[in-house]
Structures are given as structure tokens and as C-alpha cells.
């Protein structure tokens, strides 16, 4: 179409029309909206698809009919009063060619939206409320309700909001660039269709003017459910204030707690496959609140750890390839439902940990990859920016805005959703520039080394900021190497995490468990080596999702032997783990002794609870958690060597292990743990203990209630003043086959007819 003939007010050169209607104008505010025109005001609007446009006052009284300057949909009118800036004092009444109509304030009549302090903090990577600054923010500007859109794309030639309220037309709502920050912004009034629930994306031209794939909002607070890829405008109460929280007591207690001395037993959950009924885009989180929370409460776990719930396009990634780091997945319901789930957990006395992925992101075209036509979030050089193992892109942590995007994203979950901690995924891949790379495939740091200095700085800053702003929130590293000081303080040169997954312990002990009992004598050190370094870091002992997939077998499937030996061996192993120094983590299904590996497309095999052996395993996990929480000796000194002492660590011939756990260096709160990893019962097995007197058998994994043979010590044993194993007293035990015993010293206990 061509410009209208004549000399209508507001006529533009032909190239301006072409730029506006072709969605290629780099500065739409220079020509659209109100502009001084002598003693009046000239108003232009670009509204492709409009049949007519009228200017009215705020009350709807007509002021002027806008003339069509171009057949493509550019209009202009002159108001007989001077424009002085500030709030728009007119409205656009649009009659669309399909017969519908709208009347609202002109998006191009509003002044600058983001303050200079906001822009400065974004550029410094220190805007910790980024989720309330960028993205789509429902708010009131100059007395008018609407949505403020803002996105970082410094190298784009043009950015437009495209949405269901503007026909996904890039010429309808081009944005304003704020130099030199690279932030594009636009306020679209609600009367023009921008509302909570609106679906939107960004349409960008790269630095050369080439159109890019439509992009989802990196700061979206809500999204469509995959496979759809649009972002969604989130309204008030959707996870951020003013959501009505009921967990003030929980948050206050959390802030004053000592996580190292407290019991911590984590139930790791993939929310989409724990129960298939929860795969409900409206009620998923509500269903989990109704079913998962009381289930975890009954089993006695202190925390739920959720595999990544940030929105991710590929369900088969289990959430570990996320794109919307500020939005909970829409597969389970809206953001406010996720907040309500966490609120319910806290009211039930259960903490919530979230797996969080700052190491890499997928290459989906609607995501962060070459967001503005350049390597914006990632490194340009694939030797730094491409992860060969996962076919993903690596965040450029040397860039302030990228670092700030991730830091604010972490705080978003902790502050606005009240999450109790973050388990940071794939830390080892972040720390080493040559991680999973051959010579020539990586770029050394500025000193010529393999350490990723930018990642080290980022992780230290992450932990410092989280601990400063979120009292009691935990950070946990999945770090699979021997990097020193992962849980040492930042001030002492460490990374500053609260805990680290003990991957070495997990690999060694599962390797031992997989051997036939007759061969375990030659692998005894697999069970004992973890105590050599147990206090070098603050550890979590993880039996995670990664250990029950990809041909590794389920937990019960790892154990050799007939069915009885498998169940007994796994019960003994769980007892060994719960009594071992370190916090605990068990992936869902482990409590059921599922035969099949985890399948993210199916739910847990709940029917197994109808079978006595599986029900027995379930009961054992409940009782292990109860005992672990009730006995300070099993958790109070997890992080200090004073809480542990070997009694027998070298009986490889019998595959027996025994140790003491203490609640304090001089405490008489003492527990004896004995593990027999062969199917042979041992009678009269003498062990040294620090005190003569009654020792109560608190737990026997061979008890009949768990599916065992009920071999044991009749509930108690009397220790006598016969030195053994460097201790002043000793007792003689019956060791059940493939079982763990936990005995507690009872200073006031008396035993009739007990064995000695």
C-alpha cells in the first residue's frame, strides 16, 4: 500500500512508513505517539488492520478523527493543545476491520519506564529483583493499568511485543531501546488487550536486520504448557507478593536453625512422574499438595527435593534443560499453585529444595540461543560455549548481565516462592574449562589453567548473596570431583556451599552392594573409604535419580542373589546409609523397592505396597527416618569427626562393620551401629563399647515387620566390663544375616536375662 495523497498533518517520508509497517523502525517513539506541533499536539499511530481510529478524552468524549496517512494502517491527528509530556490525556478508539473495537491509552504516549538505577544495576549484574523489573509486569503507570514489557537485547536492531492481543503482528507494538543498557521497554494498557493470562513473545531483528525466530521472554514469570512455547503475563498473587503465605513460623525457625546439627533426610521427587494424576495443567500442584505432602510427612523425611520445575521444552530432560528460569512449569498448574504447594509443605513441617541449573541451557530456537542475533547469554567460541555431552550452550558467566540474570533467578525461587534451598546441578562442568573435552577443544583461563575463574567467582557470589538475603536457605552442590573447599566459606577461599553431594561414597558403596556376598570380602574398602574424607566437606549421601536410570537398575535391582537376599541386602544397605555420617537423600521409588528403573513417563509402581516385602521396605524407610530424627547421636555431629568412632572397620573376612555415633564429644548419648553384609548370622560377636550396662536394640533391619527373619537380640543387650576394641566394656551380639543393627546406650536401663 502507498501513503495517502495530500498534506494531512503528520505526513512522513516514504521510508518511515516502510519502516513502521515493515516492523523495521529502530526508534518508534520518534514518530509514534504525541509530539509538539506548534501550539498543538500531533499524534500518530501505527495500527495495521484498523478500519478507523478516533482520539477521545479519558472519559470517551471524541476529540478528533485520525486521518489515514498510509493504507497499511498509519494514522495521525492534531490536538489543539500543547503536549507537555507525562501521562497521556487522550485515548485511541480503534475500530478493527473484523468489526471489533478497543479504546485505551496510547502505548507511545508514556515516558521512560525503567529508572536509571534499575538500568545501572542490571548492567552491573547486581539487580537482585530482576524478576520484578524485566519481563512482563502487570502494573499501573500514570493511573492506567497494563503490562510493562522489558527485555535485554542490546544488539537487536528492533524488538517488538507480539501477542494474542495484537494478532502476533510485529508492527503493532515495537519497543523503545534504552541506551546504553540494551534494554527494550514498552507499556501496553490493559484496555488494548494486555492482561494477566495474555500469551506473548518477542519479535527481533538481528544486528543486520534479519528476522530471528520468535523468542520467549527470558524473564517470563509464567509460560504456556509445552509443546506450546509462548510466555504468559502473570498477574498479582502468582507466586510473588501479595500471595497469602501461612508459613511465617516456619520461615522464622528456619532462619535460626543450624543445618549441620539438624537431621536432614531428603525425598527426591520428579513431580511429573510421582503420580500421573498430577499431570494436570490446572490442578497438578494441588493434587501433589493433597497426596505427596502427607505421604512424605508419614515417611518422616525432613525435605522434599524437586527435580527442576523451571519450564523446560523437552520433558525427557527431566527439567535439566530449562529455558524459563523464572517460571515454574505450566505442566502442573499456574505459579500461584506452586507457591501454595510450598506453603502446604511448610505447614506440614517439610522443607522444599529445588534443583537449579545455571550451567547450561538448550538450543531451542525460541529460547536464549543467539537471543538478539549474537552470542548474548552464551560464549561465541564453541570451545567455551557448547557442551558436547548434552548438546547445550554454556552461560557466559564473565558477562555482568548474564551473571545477574542467574543470581536474581536463584533469589526469585528463594524469596518469592519461599523455597528452602537450591541444589545446584552440574557444578563440576562449571568449574573446569576442559570438562569432558580433549586437548584443543577448550580455551585456558587468563593464567593458562583449566579452572573456570568466572564460574568460581559466580558460585562464590551466589552463595554469599543467598546467605545474606535468605536466612536459613541452603545451597547444595552436585560436584563430582575432588575440588577442594566446596563447602568451605567464601572468606576462607572456598566456594561457600552449605553441603555437597558425596558422589564418591555413593559410587563406592553401590559398587560394593552389587557384588555377591561371597566376594564382598575383597571389596571391603568400598564401604570404609568414605570415612577417610567424610569431614573434608559437609556431605549429603545421595541415592539420586541418576542411579536408577540408563541401565543402572533400580535400587533392589542392583542387589545380587535370590529375592530374599535382595530385599535383606537393600534393607541392610539403607540401615548402613542412615547410620553413616552425612545427610540423607533417597529418590522416589527407593522406599518401595521398585523392580523397574525409573520411567519419567510413568508413575511409581504403587501396587507394590500390596506386597509384604515391598511394604516392609516402605516401613523400614519410615522407621529409619524416625530413628534418625529422634536420636541426636545419628545427626548432631554429622560434620565433625568427634561424632564417629570405628569399632570394627577391618573385618573383611566376615563383611562386618561396626562404629559408634555420639551426640557430643563427651555426651553419653551414644549409638552402636553394626552391619553384617553376608547372609550368614553371627553369634556371640563381641564388640567394644564405652559403657557397661544396658544397650537397647532400637532398630534391626532383619525384623519380621520389615520382611526379615527376626533374628536378633530380644530388644536389648547388657554390656560388661570386659575391654575390647580399645573400649573399656563390651557386649556379645547376635548379628542377623544381611542386616544392620542400631543399639542405643540406656544409662538407666535394666535387662533381665539379656545376653552378654
Swiss-Prot record:
Pfam families, alphabetized: Alpha-amylase, Alpha-amylase_C, CBM_48, GlgB_N
Q: Which InterPro entries does this UniProt record tie to the protein? A: A-amylase/branching_C, Branching_enzy, GlgB, GlgB_N, GlgB_N_E_set_prok, Glyco_hydro_13_cat_dom, Glyco_hydro_13_N, Glyco_hydro_b
| Keyword Nucleotide-binding set for record | no
What top-level branch of life does the organism fall under? Answer: Bacteria
GO cellular component terms attached to this protein's record: cytosol
- Alphabetic keyword roster: Carbohydrate metabolism, Glycogen biosynthesis, Glycogen metabolism, Glycosyltransferase, Transferase
Catalytic machinery residues: 425 (nucleophile), 478 (proton donor)
Q: Which reaction does it catalyse?
A: Transfers a segment of a (1->4)-alpha-D-glucan chain to a primary hydroxy group in a similar glucan chain
| Matching Gene3D superfamilies | Glycosidases, Golgi alpha-mannosidase II, Immunoglobulins
Gene Ontology process terms (BP): glycogen biosynthetic process
GO MF annotation terms? 1,4-alpha-glucan branching enzyme activity; cation binding; hydrolase activity, hydrolyzing O-glycosyl compounds
SMART domains recorded: Aamy (SM00642)
Q: Which EC numbers does the record give?
A: 2.4.1.18
The pathway that the record names for this protein is:
Glycan biosynthesis; glycogen biosynthesis
Q: Which family does it belong to?
A: Belongs to the glycosyl hydrolase 13 family. GlgB subfamily.
Subunit structure, interactors included: Monomer.
Its biological purpose: Catalyzes the formation of the alpha-1,6-glucosidic linkages in glycogen by scission of a 1,4-alpha-linked oligosaccharide from growing alpha-1,4-glucan chains and the subsequent attachment of the oligosaccharide to the alpha-1,6 position.
This protein is called what? Answer: 1,4-alpha-glucan branching enzyme GlgB
Q: Which organism is it from?
A: Cupriavidus necator (strain ATCC 17699 / DSM 428 / KCTC 22496 / NCIMB 10442 / H16 / Stanier 337) (Ralstonia eutropha)
- Gene field: glgB
Amino acid at each position: 500500500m502507498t501513503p495517502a495523497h495530500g498534506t494531512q498533518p503528520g505526513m512522513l517520508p516514504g521510508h518511515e512508513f516502510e519502516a513502521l509497517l515493515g516492523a523495521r523502525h529502530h526508534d518508534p517513539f520518534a514518530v509514534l505517539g504525541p509530539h509538539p506541533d506548534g501550539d498543538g499536539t500531533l499524534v500518530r499511530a501505527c495500527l495495521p488492520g484498523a478500519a478507523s481510529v478516533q482520539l477521545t478524552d479519558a472519559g470517551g468524549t471524541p476529540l478528533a478523527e485520525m486521518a489515514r496517512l498510509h493504507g497499511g494502517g498509519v494514522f495521525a491527528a492534531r490536538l489543539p493543545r500543547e503536549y507537555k509530556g507525562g501521562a497521556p490525556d487522550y485515548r485511541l478508539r480503534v475500530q478493527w476491520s473484523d468489526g471489533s473495537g478497543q479504546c485505551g491509552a496510547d502505548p507511545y504516549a508514556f515516558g521512560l519506564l525503567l529508572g536509571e538505577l534499575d538500568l545501572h544495576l542490571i548492567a552491573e549484574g547486581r539487580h537482585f529483583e530482576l524478576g520484578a523489573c524485566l519481563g512482563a509486569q502487570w502494573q499501573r503507570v500514570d493511573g492506567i493499568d497494563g503490562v510493562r514489557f522489558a527485555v535485554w537485547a542490546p544488539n537487536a536492531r528492533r524488538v517488538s511485543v507480539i501477542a494474542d492481543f495484537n494478532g502476533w503482528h510485529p508492527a503493532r507494538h515495537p519497543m523503545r531501546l534504552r541506551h546504553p543498557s540494551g534494554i527494550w521497554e514498552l507499556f501496553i494498557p490493559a484496555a488494548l488487550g494486555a492482561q494477566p493470562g495474555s500469551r506473548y513473545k518477542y519479535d527481533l531483528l538481528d544486528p543486520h536486520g534479519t528476522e530471528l525466530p520468535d523468542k520467549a521472554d527470558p524473564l517470563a514469570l509464567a509460560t504456556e504448557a509445552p509443546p506450546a512455547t509462548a510466555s504468559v503475563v502473570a498477574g498479582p498473587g502468582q507466586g510473588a507478593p501479595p500471595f497469602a503465605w501461612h508459613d511465617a513460623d516456619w520461615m522464622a525457625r528456619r532462619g535460626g536453625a543450624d543445618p549441620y546439627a539438624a537431621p536432614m533426610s531428603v525425598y527426591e521427587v520428579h513431580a511429573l512422574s510421582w503420580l500421573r494424576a498430577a499431570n494436570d495443567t490446572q490442578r497438578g500442584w494441588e493434587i501433589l499438595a493433597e497426596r505427596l505432602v502427607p505421604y512424605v510427612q508419614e515417611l518422616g523425611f525432613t525435605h522434599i527435593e524437586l527435580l527442576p520445575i523451571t519450564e523446560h521444552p523437552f520433558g525427557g530432560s527431566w527439567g535439566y534443560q530449562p529455558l524459563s528460569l523464572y517460571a515454574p512449569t505450566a505442566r502442573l498448574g499456574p505459579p500461584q499453585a506452586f507457591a501454595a504447594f510450598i506453603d502446604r509443605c511448610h505447614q506440614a513441617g517439610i522443607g522444599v529444595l529445588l534443583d537449579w541449573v545455571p550451567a547450561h541451557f538448550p538450543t531451542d530456537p525460541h529460547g536464549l540461543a543467539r537471543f538478539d542475533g549474537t552470542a548474548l547469554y552464551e560464549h561465541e567460541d564453541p570451545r567455551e560455549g557448547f557442551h558436547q555431552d548434552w548438546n547445550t550452550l554454556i552461560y557466559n558467566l564473565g558477562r555482568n548481565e548474564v551473571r545477574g540474570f542467574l543470581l536474581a533467578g536463584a533469589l526469585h525461587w528463594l524469596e518469592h516462592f519461599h523455597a528452602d534451598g537450591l541444589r545446584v546441578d552440574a557444578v563440576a562442568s562449571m568449574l573446569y574449562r576442559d570438562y569432558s573435552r580433549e586437548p584443543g577443544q577448550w580455551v585456558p583461563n587468563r593464567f593458562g589453567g583449566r579452572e573456570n575463574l568466572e564460574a568460581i567467582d559466580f558460585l562464590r557470589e551466589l552463595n554469599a548473596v543467598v546467605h545474606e538475603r535468605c536466612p536459613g536457605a541452603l545451597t547444595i552442590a552436585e560436584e563430582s570431583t575432588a575440588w577442594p573447599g566446596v563447602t568451605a566459606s567464601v572468606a576462607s577461599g572456598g566456594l561457600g556451599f552449605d553441603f555437597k553431594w558425596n558422589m564418591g561414597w555413593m559410587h563406592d558403596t553401590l559398587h560394593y552392594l552389587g557384588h555377591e556376598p561371597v566376594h564382598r570380602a575383597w571389596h571391603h574398602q568400598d564401604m570404609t573409604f568414605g570415612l577417610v574424607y567424610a569431614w573434608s566437606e559437609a556431605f549429603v549421601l545421595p541415592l539420586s535419580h541418576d542411579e536408577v536410570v540408563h541401565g543402572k537398575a533400580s535400587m533392589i535391582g542392583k542387589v545380587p542373589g535370590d529375592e530374599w537376599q535382595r530385599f535383606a541386602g537393600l534393607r541392610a544397605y539403607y540401615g548402613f546409609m542412615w547410620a553413616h555420617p552425612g545427610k540423607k537423600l533417597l529418590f522416589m521409588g527407593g522406599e518401595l523397592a521398585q523392580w523397574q528403573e525409573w520411567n519419567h513417563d510413568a508413575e511409581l509402581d504403587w501396587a507394590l505396597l500390596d506386597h509384604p516385602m515391598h511394604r516392609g521396605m516402605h516401613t523400614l524407610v519410615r522407621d529409619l527416618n524416625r530413628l534418625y530424627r529422634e536420636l541426636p547421636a545419628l545427626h548432631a555431629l554429622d560434620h565433625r569427626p568427634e561424632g564417629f568412632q570405628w569399632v570394627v572397620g577391618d573385618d573383611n573376612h566376615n563383611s562386618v562393620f561396626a562404629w559408634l555415633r555420639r551426640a557430643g564429644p563427651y555426651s553419653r548419648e551414644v549409638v552402636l551401629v553394626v552391619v553384617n553384609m553376608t547372609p550368614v548370622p553371627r553369634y556371640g560377636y563381641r564388640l567394644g563399647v564405652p559403657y557397661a550396662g544396658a544397650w537397647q536394640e532400637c532398630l534391626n533391619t532383619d525384623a519380621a515387620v520389615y520382611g526379615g527373619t527376626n533374628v536378633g537380640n530380644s530388644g536389648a543387650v547388657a554390656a560388661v566390663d570386659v575391654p575390647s576394641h580399645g573400649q573399656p566394656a563390651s557386649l556379645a551380639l547376635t548379628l542377623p544375616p544381611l542386616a544392620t543393627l542400631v543399639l542405643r546406650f540406656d544409662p538407666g536401663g535394666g535387662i533381665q536375662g539379656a545376653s552378654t
